[in-house]
Amino acid sequence: MQPTRNESTTKRPPVRREPLDRSSSDAVIHDGTAYIAAQVPDDGLATVAEQTQSVLDKLDAVLARCGTSKRKLLTATVYCADSRHFDEVNTRWDAWVPWHDPPGCQYVVAKLRKREHKISIQVAAAI
């Protein structure tokens, strides 16, 4: 005989979305994890270092809205339009991420949505 499932064991945690616009969310929170959409810089004409700092500042803000911080990062994916930018991006990243709480991180060369964007970062964090 199959055991019956009671209501409390079959309920799933709610999904919370931090809206960005109609087609995407800045973050989706589920089961104690915040999945942050890839953030892009505000100024596409800025230097790589400035674009990176802009993205890191945006990540701080989105993480705070989700009730977490960079200290609880689980993973990070850094997208660069050109592999020659990795060293400059990594300098800013290393200054920003807590050295004693680093996430699993990967760097990817990718064509970004807007040609002037040189950097984009996507993260997931524990709540």
Residue ranges and their predicted role:
Residues 1-74, 80-127:
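N-terminal presequence-like segments and the immediate start of the first folded domain
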